[in-house]
Design a protein with these regions (language model features):
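Phosphate/anion-contacting hairpin/loop surfaces
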Residues: 13-17, 88-198, 206
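A cross-family signal for N-terminal binding/gating loops and helix N-caps
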Residues: 14-130, 263, 279-306
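Generic detection of long, well-ordered alpha-helical segments
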Residues: 18-21, 153, 157, 211-219
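Glycine-centered secondary-structure boundary/capping sites
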Residues: 37, 65, 148-151, 200
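Basic, nucleic-acid-binding surfaces and adjacent catalytic neighborhoods in DNA/RNA-processing proteins
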Residues: 39-59, 72, 100, 108, ...
Length: 306
């Protein structure tokens, strides 16, 4: 019998791939036509952790009878804009998924939402890290999000100059900088690797030492990588699925992520994998030159895996 994978790892030896901006945007695009204009007639919250610290019974009562006016997204948050100036802010975290009209309740069902047209939405989450927060009023929504996420990469304000201001003075490796949701919303491990490769920047290079030209390339590469992920309807490496249970295809288009030992698509040299701060990181060190030892962030632990 093969050894079981550690609880928080996939069998490939990487930390599980969390849904990032493209995966959440894919879910939004699939759910919006089904939900917008529909009334919620029944809600069953089966896991009290989903609404913690709020009482799930109180949240259920407030959701019943609400009209879904819009389904939007902020970073990795899926936002249901409801009648009565209410907002349901959902985060899938590690293993959360939203399914539309499954024949049967899947294992690990945590929430059931019944609509007035007879359809239903099921939230499943094996690891139970996902959350659902109901807030009242746009100011409360904005404050909740502002405390947790930074700029939206597809907003007009996300320019190379804005990225320069965010990175100024920061000695952390640029990959760690990209993963900080309080600065740039929605970029996770997959799209950070893909963006850095597109920009020709090594993940260990200190964020605050990037030149203006590098920052301009990085800004464009972030947008391009995220747009490619959306076009492919997300990456289904571990748990991510569409609302009908289908898989995304971006994992078949990775340039470097999870391609250790394979040839670089640009130069043909083998892609390397590092473990940096516990995160699997993929790089072509010919196309993304490693920073000199003196310029590498001091606090970063790096383990090479070929």
């Amino acid at each position: 019998m093969p050894p079981r994978c550690p609880a928080l790892r996939s069998c490939s030896g990487n930390l599980r791939a969390l849904p990032e901006l493209p995966e959440v945007e894919t879910i939004r695009r699939q759910l919006a036509p089904q939900l917008e204009g529909r009334m919620i007639v029944e809600v069953q919250i089966l896991d009290p952790r989903w609404t913690r610290p709020e009482d799930p019974a109180a949240v259920q009562a407030q959701l019943r009878g609400a009209l879904v006016e819009r389904v939007t997204r902020a970073g990795k948050y899926l936002v249901w804009d409801l009648s009565g100036d209410r907002y349901l802010l959902m985060h899938l975290r590690m293993t959360g998924a939203l399914l539309f009209d499954p024949d049967l309740d899947p294992p690990h069902t945590r929430v059931r939402v019944q609509l007035d047209d007879g359809h239903r939405v099921i939230y499943v989450d094996p690891r139970r890290f996902g959350t659902g927060h109901l807030v009242h009023g746009a100011p409360a929504r904005d404050a909740y999000l502002a405390a947790r996420i930074g700029i939206e990469p597809f907003s007009p304000e996300f320019t190379a100059e804005h990225l320069r201001r965010l990175a100024a003075g920061r000695q952390a490796p640029v990959k760690a900088f990209l993963l900080d949701q309080r600065r740039i919303a929605g970029v996770g491990n997959i799209y950070a690797d893909e963006a850095l490769f597109r920009a020709g920047i090594h993940p260990l290079r200190p964020a605050g030492r990037l030149s203006r030209a590098q920052l301009a390339r990085l800004r464009d590469a972030i947008v391009d990588a995220l747009a490619a992920g959306i076009e492919a309807k997300g990456a289904s490496i571990d748990d991510f699925r569409h609302v009908d249970g289908a898989r995304g295809s971006f994992q078949d288009r990775f340039l470097v992520h999870r391609r250790a030992g394979e040839p670089c698509p640009t130069c043909g040299r083998p892609i390397k994998r590092f473990v940096v701060g516990g995160r699997g990181t993929y790089v072509c060190e010919h196309c993304q030159p490693r920073p000199r030892a003196g310029s590498r962030p001091r606090a970063v632990r790096v383990r090479s895996e070929g």
